[in-house]
Amino acid sequence: MRGGELSKGEEVVVEPMIIGVIPQFPPLSKQNIYGKVRMPPVGILSVLTQLKRDFGIEVYAIDENNYGGPMDSNGLPDHRALQKRQPVKLFMGYGGMSNSISRMYAVARYYQSQGIPTIAGGSHVDALPREALNSGIDVVVHGEGEETAIEIVRAMIHEGRVVKDYKKKLEQIIGISYLNEHDNYVFTGKREPIRNLDALADPDLGIVRFMAKDWSAIPISRGRGCNFKCEFCVVNKQYGPFKASSVEKVFNNIKNYVENGYKRFFVVDDNFAQNIPETIELCKLLGDYRSKSKKRFDIMVQVRTEVAENNDLIEAMRYAGVSSLAIGYESPINEELKAMRKGVTVEKLVQRSRKLSQFFHLHGMFIFGYPSFNDSKYKSDMSLSQKAKAYYKFFKDARIDTIQVFNAVPLPGSELRMKLEAENRIPPLEEIGWDKYDGLFLCYRPENGVDAFELQNLPLAMMKKRYLGSFLKRNLNYANWMNWAYDLSIGFPINFSIYYAKRFAHNLKQKEQWKGIMRKKERLLHKRNVFYESLVDAWQDTKKRIKNLAITTYGADIVRKWMRLYEKSSYSSALKKLTQVAVENNIR
C-alpha cells in the first residue's frame, strides 16, 4: 500500500486500538534539510507493526510532518477530530527527537485528559524518563520496544477495554518507567536486548494515514547499535554494539518495495558497513536483482570513510545502486576529532574522501566549534575564524559535494551533555528550549574566550556561502540560473569532454592494476575497454554535476527561507544571556 491512501476519505473497516504519533517539528526546524525530507522514523512503525502482527490489534500512525488530515485553529493536526473519527484506546508517541519533544508532550496530554493511557519511547524519553512522566506520558519504554510494547498492551487492555488498575501489572514488565499509584517513580530495570532481529516484523509504512504527500525516500533499517562510542552520540548507549537482521531479510524488504514501485531508499543504520562481508553479500544480491529484473532504484547510505580502504566493498555498493554516501566527517581539526573519539585523522579523511568522490555523491556532515572543557586532554588553540577557514579548505580538498554544518547538540543521555552539565554550561529550558536542539542553534555556554554570537553565526555563514554564494552571486545568479543555462547548453559538451579526458587518463593508469587484482576474483561491474569505460564514467560525472547543481539550488532555497525566519525569531536574546554569563565567568 502506498502511504497516504486513507487521506482521501476511505473508511476504516476495523476500529483502531492504538494511534502512534510522530510529532511535528517546530517552525524553524521545519525549514532545515531534515524537516524537508518526508521520511518517517522506523522505530515507532516497527513497534506498531509488531503489535498488529503478534497481538492481532488494529493500529495506525500519523506523521505530523507529512500530514493532510483535519487541522485545528492553530494550523496543527486536530487530534480531537481524529479521536471523534477513529477513537483509540491507547496513545503511543515517538520521543526520539529532542526538538519535537514538546509537541509530543502536548499531544500526549490531550489523550491523557481523555482517559487514554499514553506510552512513549525513543532516545530523549529514554534519557529523561522523569521529565516524560511529568509531561503527559504514563509509561516510558527504554531501549528496544517491540517485545516490551506487547507486554504493556497485555497489561493495559482486556477484552478491548482499558484496565483501570493496569499499573499494578506494570512492575512485572522489565525495561519501563512509570509513576505508581502513589506517584512514586518506578524503573523496572534494564531489559535484555533483542537477539534475533529476523523474528521481528518488517515496518509497515501502510499504517501511516492522512499523509499529505508520498515519502521522499523509503527508510530501511538492517541493524541497531554502533561499535563506536563518539562523545556526542547516544546510539551505542541506547542500543549497545551493532547487531543486524539477516542479509536475506533486508534484501527481501527492499525487493518488495521495488516491486511496489518505490525507487528511492535511505538506509538509516548509522554505519552501513559495520559488518563488511555481510554488506558486500547484501549489495551483490541487490545488484543481481537489478541486473535480472532491469528495475532501477537509488540507495543512499551512511558510512564512515573507512569504506574507502576496501575496493571490493566500493565495487559492491556501486553494483547495488548505492549512489550517495552520507559521511559524518564532523571536523577538519585533529584535536577536535580526538576529543570526539572519532578514531581518525584529518589526513586520512581527506585521502579517503577523495577516493570515494570518484564513485559516489558525498554529503558531508560537520560539527563546528566542538566544545572543550577544563580537563580536556585535546584542545585546539585556533580561533573560530581560523577554524572556519580550515572547514572551507577541507570541503575543497576532500571533494565533498554537499554539506551541512551544525553546532554541537548536547543530546540528553550523551557524554557531551554530562560534561557540559558538570561545568554548569547548559542553560535552563526557559532560556533555550528543546525546540532549539536541532543543530542550528547554540544550546550551551561556550568556553571562556569564545564569543557565543560568532559560534552561532559562523556555521550559518558557511552554509550560506556554500549554497547561496557571495552577495554578487546571490543577486546576479539567483537560483543558479547562469549555471543551469551554461550546463544545459554549451557547457554540456565542454564538461563532458573534460570529464572524459580525466577518466581516460585515470582508467589507463589503473588498467594494469585491475588486471592483476581481478585475475584472482570475479568482477561485479564488468570492465569494458578503456575507451568505453571512460565514456560511461564521464557520463556519470556529468550526471553528478547536474545532480549537485539541483541539490545546491534546492539547498539555497532552504537556507534562504530559514535565514528569514531566524532573523525574525527571538533567539538573539538567548544568545545575549549566553554571552553575559561567559563575561561574568571571565571576570571571576
Please describe what each predicted stretch is.
Residues 27-30, 129-131, 228, 276-277, ...:
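Flexible glycine/acidic-rich beta-alpha junction loops that bind and position SAM and/or redox cofactors
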Residues 16, 113-117, 295-297, 360:
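A short helix->loop->beta-strand "cap" motif at the edges of active sites that frequently abuts
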Residues 130-134, 312-314, 372-396:
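Catalytic cores of alpha/beta
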Residues 50-190, 413:
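Glycine-rich beta-alpha loop elements in corrinoid/cobalamin-binding modules
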Residues 29-44:
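Glycine- and acidic-residue-enriched helix-capping/strand-helix junction motifs
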Residues 2-17, 24-32, 173, 178-222:
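N-terminal [4Fe-4S]-dependent radical SAM core
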Residues 1-20, 58, 79-87, 181, ...:
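Radical SAM enzyme core and accessory elements
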Residues 198-372, 381, 393:
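Radical SAM [4Fe-4S] cluster-binding motif and immediate context
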